[in-house]
Amino acid sequence: MSEINSQALREAAEQAMHDDWGFDADLFHELVTPSIVLELLDERERNQQYIKRRDQENEDIALTVGKLRVELETAKSKLNEQREYYEGVISDGSKRIAKLESNEVREDGNQFLVVRHPGKTPVIKHCTGDLEEFLRQLIEQDPLVTIDIITHRYYGVGGQWVQDAGEYLHMMSDAGIRIKGE
């Protein structure tokens, strides 16, 4: 309370209640003037308005927290859905990669050699054994020979993938296609 001596007012009120003769009640009545009562009522009203504002703020905060919780749960749900979706995509991709890796070209048996002897037409040869030994023999026969090694990918009848020359030749002959050999 601003201009009111609240302690003196309290003491006068307590003494006025306990005095049988009413002498101290006169002191209380002197201290409690209409302006004091109005000031006390104004202060009480300000306190009630303050409490009401705080209650409204608390209610607004509670509503905001509730909305944020709903948004958080929605975001968590979407995140879980996306995580599951991308885990599926990763799984499918991993399976696809594994399948593609299993279909990789094996170089053994898929290599052809373009052999060029000086002054002669280049010849294409297919190595069926150890490649290094085969190359060594070619170089021993003609040290000036140049050799290009070509790895070939075979596609058989109907565009099917085949792993090596032997499988390719077998598939072609099964389809009735004759291949002129060396």
From Swiss-Prot:
InterPro entries: Ead_Ea22. Pfam families: Ead_Ea22 (PF13935). It comes from the Viruses. This is Protein ea22.
